[in-house]
């Protein structure tokens, strides 16, 4: 049985932990780590499995599968700690992998230590189709992210440019550019663009549009892909996570589904 250690006790980390704790994922929740030890301890105590709250190094030693659900800034430390000890790792903060050096480092480590790196689809649909389409030529990939004010409030791009989202009373596009830039400007909002870039045409050629839309209550991701295979258009209207409006509930469900697939012998999907 997999012994899973979760790094990060935020909205997504907690949803994943609950899914393991209630048996949705057939594994053991071994340990939790968060910079806020008090929060992690309180949350762990609320679970029936009573996982231990451990420092990162001890969590990795105690587990045989590690989940990063913290932040882009934590990915390097968590992934290297896990892979160096031959632990497979699932990365939720996929935007960190826009760093080519980091991506190549962890790929090499995974090969050397005979383990795997898992990147869930997140809050978008159609990733399997894009992965299949990438076998031939893809001409263009565009993702348009529409979020209510609270879903984008505080993003570095908004703060640096003094954008007042509260003054917007109609849908307003505030950013259009390559995924490589979008991921840095909106690190808590467009991780889906990173997953899409990795399976498609890369971070520089994937176009990201960000729209503040005060008329909606959901996080909407629209994807358009054109290539030799034909055309793909998907729209997903996501309910925000209960404790973090910047995160979609589907992102947590995607992580849970990935863990279930890791634990099960039957693998479905491209």
Curated annotation (Swiss-Prot):
Keywords, sorted A to Z:
NAD, NADP, Oxidoreductase, Pyridine nucleotide biosynthesis
Q: State its Enzyme Commission number(s).
A: 1.4.1.21
Question: Which residues of the sequence carry a binding annotation for NAD(+)?
Answer: 123, 191
The first-level EC class reads oxidoreductase
Q: Name one Pfam family in it.
A: NAD_binding_3
**So where's the catalytic machinery, residue-wise?**
221
Highest taxon, organism lineage: Archaea
Reactions catalysed according to its record: L-aspartate + NADP(+) + H2O = oxaloacetate + NH4(+) + NADPH + H(+); L-aspartate + NAD(+) + H2O = oxaloacetate + NH4(+) + NADH + H(+)
Biological processes annotated in GO:
NAD biosynthetic process
Record-linked Gene3D superfamilies: Dihydrodipicolinate Reductase, domain 2, NAD(P)-binding Rossmann-like Domain
- Its job: Specifically catalyzes the NAD or NADP-dependent dehydrogenation of L-aspartate to iminoaspartate.
Name the protein family: Belongs to the L-aspartate dehydrogenase family.
- HAMAP family tied to this protein: NadX
Q: Add the further remark from the entry.
A: The iminoaspartate product is unstable in aqueous solution and can decompose to oxaloacetate and ammonia.
Q: Know the name of this protein? A: L-aspartate dehydrogenase
Q: Which organism is it from?
A: Methanocella arvoryzae (strain DSM 22066 / NBRC 105507 / MRE50)
């Amino acid at each position: 049985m997999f012994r899973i250690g979760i790094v990060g006790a935020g909205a997504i980390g907690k949803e994943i932990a609950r899914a393991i704790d209630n048996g949705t994922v057939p594994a053991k929740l071994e340990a939790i780590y968060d910079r806020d030890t008090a929060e992690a301890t309180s949350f762990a105590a609320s679970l029936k499995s009573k996982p231990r709250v451990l420092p990162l190094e001890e969590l990795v030693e105690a587990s045989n599968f590690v989940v990063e659900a913290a932040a882009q800034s934590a990915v390097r430390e968590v992934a290297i700690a896990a892979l160096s000890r031959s632990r497979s790792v699932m990365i939720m903060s996929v935007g960190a992998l826009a760093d080519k050096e980091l991506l190549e480092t962890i790929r090499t480590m995974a090969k050397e230590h005979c383990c795997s790196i898992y990147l869930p689809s997140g809050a978008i649909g159609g990733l399997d189709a894009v992965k299949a389409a990438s076998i031939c030529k893809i001409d263009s990939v565009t993702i348009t992210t529409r979020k209510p004010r609270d879903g984008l409030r505080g993003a570095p791009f908004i703060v640096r440019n003094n954008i007042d989202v509260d003054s917007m009373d109609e849908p307003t596009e505030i950013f259009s550019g390559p995924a490589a830039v979008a991921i840095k400007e909106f690190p808590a909002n467009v991780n889906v663009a990173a997953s899409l870039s990795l399976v498609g045409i890369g971070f520089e050629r994937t176009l990201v549009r960000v729209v503040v839309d005060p008329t909606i209550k959901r996080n909407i991701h629209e994807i358009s892909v054109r290539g030799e295979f034909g055309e793909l258009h998907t729209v997903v209207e996501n309910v925000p996570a209960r404790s973090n409006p910047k995160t979609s509930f589907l992102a947590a469900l995607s992580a849970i589904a990935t863990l279930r697939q890791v634990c099960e012998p039957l693998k479905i999907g491209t």
